[in-house]
Amino acid sequence: MDIFCIRGGTPLHGRIALHGAKNAALPLLAATLATGARCELLDCPDISDVTAACAILRHLGCAVEQHGGIVAVDSGSACRSDIPAELMRKMRAAVLFLGPLLARFGTAELSLPGGCVLGARPIDLHLRGLRRMGAEITLDGEHISARTDGLHGCTVALPLPSVGATENLILAALGCRGTLTLCNAAREPEIGDLIAFLRACGADIRGEGSLLRIRGGVPLTGACHTVLPDRMEAATYLAAAAATRGDVTLTNVRPEHLTAVLAVLEHAGCTLTQQNGMLRLRCSRLRAAGPIRTAPYDGFPTDAQAPLMAAMAVAEGVTVFEENLFENRFRHVPALRALGAHIHAARRYAVVTGVRELHGASMTATDLRGGAAMVIGALCARGESELAGTAHLKRGYAELVPTLRACGADITER
């Protein structure tokens, strides 16, 4: 089943329990390799990217058990340091295994990762930092070969706060001699979650925010850790509730991780209330909010740009989006136009003039968050829409269809 059929026009009403974050679970799974012990991750989302990460761990020799939202990994039996191209192609975050492989085995053979096509998204910062730590890395076409006689501590100053590079260097530093000082590190909550897990395993990681010090060579143990709630899943459902003029309450949510998104929604006329660990959004009239500029945390997240654009397509007034992190991140715009949205996009900017009503259309998702935007657009459109390419959505949203149906959406999968 890979097509969603959506009949729009029904406001979303209900309660949604958020899953563990995709962007936290994937680096956590890579981190289990570095421990050489048994680890348990609770509230791990049932998404295809997690399945792909578990397949990589099994290929490397780890024992992996998946039961509901619990993933147990025993990496004591890991015996390989190569990842075949067919596994690497399944997700962008597969490159996060490079650091722990070097830390654990001193060698790694892999290829450039897959995942969503969002422009260049180079891994140069990963490789540059690892080379500075003593790794010899060659890149032959799409093949990456890495070797080291022993990583060593040093100071790495990232030219920009790359999330992936920060995670990879933290994981590599677990096996280095001395201390890695990481400057201009990314500050996303998912990195804080990774550090909390590693500290529970015994890692010596000091500092917080953009300056981190990781002392390598410290013996690690296993740990049980609950994955951080998914703030991008939260942003998506909040945008859907706003677009359909609904009333939705999120549970298992961390509002403090959504500051920039909540500010935009409040500016757009949504009523937001927080109580007892829950976040409620009510919307009867949606106004344009902007300009919306994507930025590293704690700015407006690039992963929320597409879902919010779908909501602004049916808001009163004009909203300007400025995408500052990734090129090629307006690939959802043609599909929203097919629904009747008035959007002009050029280079880093998209100008959205809200319309009173969208109409059904046939669309194909080309990436995870763009696919979410298409679902939101279809939910508030008159008539029926069909969305193909839903495998992209299954990479990052667990139980999307039943969750929306429970809130009153007319959505089926075939």
Please tell me what each predicted stretch does.
Residues 1-414:
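Short, structured segments at the rim of ligand-binding sites
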